[in-house]
Amino acid sequence: MRTYLILSLSLLWATVAQGQSNTDMMKAIMGGQGQVEQDNSPFKPLGFTGSYTWVINSYKGGTLDKDSPMLLRMAFDDEHMAWEPQARPNEGAMRMIFDLKNKVNYTLMTDEKGKRTGVKMKAMRITMNDADHASDKATQVVRTQETKVIDEHTCRKYTYKDEEGSGVAWIAEDVKFNAFEALGSMVGARADRWQMAPYQGMVMENAWTSADGGERVEMSTRDLVIGKVDKALFSTDGYELQDMTNLPVFGR
């Protein structure tokens, strides 16, 4: 669960850092915990159509991070994912599109003057190392009997704990979507571990605290729409694209 939080946050922070290649972003995400390689895995439909917004607050030493809250709009259909962080005042906008079927990704940028540019690159996957997964395997997850209603969905309380920290997640089990599977499209040889999440459903609220109490991350899901999506979020129309799919994948 913590890996899910950290990867999600890292993807959000990476999309804000304009000018980095996908490989550089992936390397920064993993912090040396995995290898970046081209995605040659068989295509598998995502199995979910919809959208939502993540609201993420990070704390250190009990103090809210200056960049919080961070908002990330996410959209899905069988063949695509789109990530769109909320633009800050006087800054350009960015959107990332993951074409799961054709194995290419797009980073689209709109500057302060409205100029639209983008980069097309090969899809990347991360091959995790054994040390990282040893920690994941040791995570203790408990499905409790406690429930509450969030945005008209009955959510069940889960608790989780490992040597790095502990947390509480409220999961809408009626929503047939596994975020581990969606994020797993970016994970390499051991992506099956993402599929072994001890639940099926949408994480509506999640709070993780480090073992020493110095860090805390709170995430909530808002504006959940199921069964339909704005296809424009997967479109590159109107952007001047630079095709970099012929470049070699560095950092393997």
Q: How does the language model describe each region?
A:
Residues 21-252:
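Extended soluble regions of mature proteins
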